[in-house]
């Protein structure tokens, strides 16, 4: 069983201190050890990033874009290799892993437009012989802390754009599935990224706290659970750091009586059970307007849930792999137990699911609850597993109130043929991302990603235009070149045109 390394100042750095096991969730076996950085190791990465910043910030944006474009090409050329690593350590299917990587590459493509997105604004003759302009300048050393569920995509939300903007970066990926993240960072260096511009440090809370406490780190981007997002936001902002912290979710799909039910069912199957439900944009609640809609939905869902193809993620032709860890498997099982105990109707039970030849894997089958109510734990909390809850309401207004009353506000969607209902829903619903006849309203790379309420801590969303704003500071410059042979008297009144 090999041990992974940190990537600091362009070099692989061994660490003989604390470590954690990385598991193959399909077999339950430990396959690697990942080092957990102490303060000394983290400081090496901070020092490397700090030393690299002056030269990188002064590198022309077009030169930065050339490195990013070569990086994009290398990612595409290594898709199969990266996808296999994701699947081995996370458990998601190879097809799902490849899709994750493709969405990440879209963010690299957006970052390749650095010469355009960093142009700033210019105004000539704002006053007599006075010109003014504003531009985007990098912050300095910035950091990202990323979750296990998208080991390729979420880091690619962060550091390509941060680096394109002229910053240097320290990435603390999830210790559960770090190999693909490390390989991708190596490919960035292969593309010509200078040493120290991107550093990868593995770790746990000690490393997180070190980044929060380091005065050299000017901004932190985080994706993960709400309690940790809240902690990172509070600890970072009280030290004067810029922080964007994306937290948990409880995403609802509203099904209207006029919905195309066959298309809605197909959408819900992928959104609820894809990646074993381990997505912050997973649909975990289906809100049916009317009993007739709910009954018809369940009748169509049940056979499809029971027919899900489940197995080792690296096998071909699957719908779903295992959960990421034994702890995750136990937690989701506990939620199913809770739903039964609190009176929800368990229509399909995924507990105890086993895959032949992989009896020690962290598998669950798809589960479906009906007649779930808002006071139940399975409705209130993020399950992060292959569990779909059906809630019955009598009107669109009741469905909207249900969603607006929930503490999370990440994403939601509505299935309807009624344009008036869809427009009302988009206007009045209190979440950050809305889909109309689209199950996973994940924006493309040139729009920003993020929720409302307790799904986001901070003022700016991830990637896209908000990403540029997060990783830069605006500087306004006013210059005057007096005409020759002229002298202007002192002006004591407030200057005006």
Swiss-Prot record:
| EC assignment | 1.2.1.27
**Induction of its expression:** Is subject to regulation by the transcriptional activator BauR.
Keyword list, A-Z: NAD, Oxidoreductase
Annotated GO biological processes are: beta-alanine biosynthetic process; thymine catabolic process; valine catabolic process
Keyword Protein biosynthesis on this protein? no
Q: Where is the active site?
A: 280 (nucleophile)
Where does this protein hold NAD(+)?
148, 172, 175-176, 225, 382
Q: Where are the membrane-spanning stretches?
A: none
Please explain the role this protein plays, according to its UniProt record.
Involved in the degradation of beta-alanine. Likely catalyzes the NAD(+)- and CoA-dependent oxidative decarboxylation of malonate semialdehyde (3-oxopropanoate) to acetyl-CoA.
Describe the family membership recorded for this protein in Swiss-Prot or TrEMBL: Belongs to the aldehyde dehydrogenase family.
Q: What is this protein called?
A: Malonate-semialdehyde dehydrogenase
Specify the species: Pseudomonas aeruginosa (strain ATCC 15692 / DSM 22644 / CIP 104116 / JCM 14847 / LMG 12228 / 1C / PRS 101 / PAO1)
- What gene does this protein come from? bauC
């Amino acid at each position: 069983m090999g041990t992974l390394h940190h990537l600091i100042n362009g070099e692989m750095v061994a660490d003989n201190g604390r470590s954690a096991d990385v598991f193959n969730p399909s077999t339950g076996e430990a396959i690697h050890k990942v080092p957990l950085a102490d303060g000394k190791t983290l400081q090496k990465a901070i020092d490397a990033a700090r030393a690299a910043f002056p030269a990188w910030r002064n590198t022309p944006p077009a030169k930065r874009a050339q490195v990013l474009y070569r990086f994009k090409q290398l990612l595409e050329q290594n898709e199969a290799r990266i996808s296999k690593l994701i699947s081995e350590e996370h458990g998601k299917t190879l097809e799902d892993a490849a899709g994750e990587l493709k969405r990440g590459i879209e963010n690299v493509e957006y970052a390749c437009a650095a010469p355009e997105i960093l142009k700033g604004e210019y105004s000539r003759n704002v006053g007599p012989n006075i010109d003014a302009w504003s531009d985007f300048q990098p912050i300095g050393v910035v950091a990202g802390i990323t979750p296990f569920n998208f080991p390729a995509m979420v880091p690619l939300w962060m550091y390509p754009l941060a680096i394109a903007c002229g910053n240097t970066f320290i990435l603390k990926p999830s210790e559960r599935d770090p190999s693909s993240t490390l390989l991708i960072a190596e490919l960035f260096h292969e593309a010509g990224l200078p040493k120290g511009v991107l550093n990868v440090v593995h770790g746990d809370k000690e490393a997180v706290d070190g980044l929060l406490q380091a005065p050299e780190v000017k901004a932190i981007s985080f994706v993960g659970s709400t309690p940790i997002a809240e902690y990172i936001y509070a600890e970072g902002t009280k030290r004067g750091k810029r922080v964007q912290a994306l937290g948990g979710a409880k995403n609802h799909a509203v099904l209207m009586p006029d919905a195309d039910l066959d298309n809605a069912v197909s959408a819900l199957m992928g959104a609820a059970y894809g990646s074993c439900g381990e997505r912050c944009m997973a649909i975990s609640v289906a809100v049916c307007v009317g009993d007739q809609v709910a009954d018809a939905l369940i009748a169509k869902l049940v056979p499809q849930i029971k027919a899900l193809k489940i197995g080792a993620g690296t096998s071909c032709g699957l719908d779903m792999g295992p959960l990421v860890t034994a702890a995750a498997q136990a937690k989701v099982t506990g939620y199913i137990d809770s739903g039964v105990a609190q009176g929800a109707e368990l229509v399909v039970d995924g507990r105890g699911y086993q895959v032949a030849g992989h009896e020690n894997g962290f598998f669950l089958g798809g589960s479906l609850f009906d007649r779930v109510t808002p006071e139940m734990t399975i409705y209130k909390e993020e399950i992060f597993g292959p569990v779909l809850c059906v809630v019955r309401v009598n009107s669109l207004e009741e469905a909207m109130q249900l969603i607006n009353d929930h503490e999370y506000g990440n994403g939601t969607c509505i299935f309807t043929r009624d344009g008036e209902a869809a427009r009302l829903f988009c206007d009045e619903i209190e979440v950050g991302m809305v889909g109309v006849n689209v199950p996973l309203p994940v924006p493309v790379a040139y729009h920003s990603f993020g929720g409302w309420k307790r799904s986001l801590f901070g003022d700016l969303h991830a990637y896209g235009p908000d990403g540029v704003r997060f990783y830069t500071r605006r500087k306004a410059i006013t210059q005057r070149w007096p005409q020759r042979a002229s002298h202007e008297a002192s002006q004591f009144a407030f200057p005006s045109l």
